[in-house]
């Protein structure tokens, strides 16, 4: 399963639902884009260290953006940016999940609902 950035943020904030979801999956993966978004949102060196520890200790596979994912994301932007407001990071994350034939766990299912061939698992945090 690919985890969207929001699920990871909830996990790092101590949300039990996010922890259960992540821990229940034997194949845990995130797009390199999500790792970048987490690091970009860090407010201190300590938070950066926490993010790195989380990725290592959770046995989460980082999926790089390759040529195939880039081309799929480009077509998703073309198809969904105007009508649905699909943004670049979400297109790359969706393309990563679709190319890997993995479901995408996200609290923002509406961002991805129009994308054919993408299995979306809606996530709802305990705190939300």
Language-model segment annotations:
Residues 1-30, 40-53, 127-128:
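Short, well-structured N-terminal submotif of metal-dependent ribonuclease cores
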Residues 4-5, 38, 97, 112:
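Generic structural signal for small/hydrophobic residues in well-ordered secondary structure
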Residues 7-8, 34, 69, 92-93, ...:
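Alpha-helix capping/helix-boundary segments
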Residues 24-25, 58, 115-116:
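Short, structured coil segments at secondary-structure junctions
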Residues 36-39, 74:
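Amphipathic alpha-helical segments within well-ordered protein domains
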Residues 99-128:
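Acidic, PIN/NYN-like endoribonuclease modules and their adjacent C-terminal/linker elements
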